[in-house]
Swiss-Prot record:
Belongs to the thymidylate kinase family. Phosphorylation of dTMP to form dTDP in both de novo and salvage pathways of dTTP synthesis. ATP binds at G7, I8, D9, T10, C11, G12, K13, S14. One of its GO terms (molecular function) is ATP binding. NCBIfam families: DTMP_kinase (TIGR00041). Its EC number is 2.7.4.9. It is an enzyme of class 2 (transferase). This is Thymidylate kinase.
Amino acid sequence: MYILFEGIDTCGKSTQMELLTQKHPGIITTHEPGGTAFGQQAREILLSDSLRSKRAELLLFLADRAEHYEEVVEPNHDKIVVSDRGFVSGIGYALANGDFDFDELVALNRFALKDHFPDRIILFMTDMETLKQRISEKELDGIELRGLEYLLRVQEHMKESILKLGIPHLFIDATDSIENIHQSILTYLKV
């Protein structure tokens, strides 16, 4: 089973992945970008926000996604693989950047993922107040420097994309307690 934990920065995905693997050590965890050797190099470029072209940024994310799928997800198709981010983030950020068509983005991601979208998606949804508080506690990367409104637009595009695609999903209130969120995830995944 291939599962995505999706959401904007500081929404609690990584914390929940840690809790899930503590409870179920057999689960394979990974992340995009950066879940492969190539992905780590791509991640450095992407987080530096040094690319002027949003198309180049999109293509680098897609190259990472294709490599990640082939190197991590596909060989473990008989196991539970949980990725901190994936194609939904890619579509959400691309739509927030403007000048991209949803159907085109879906087609490009289908190609990168060999036509294998995740079996389930968990989207962590936050609000302006929580985002502002959590962002203030960390050093910002190039993408986070685009602003809070930008990040919340990305989040809305993620939600809309999941609904349009009809992939089984759970929307989580990321402002809830860590324990309540964890319990909701366990119940949804039935693990």
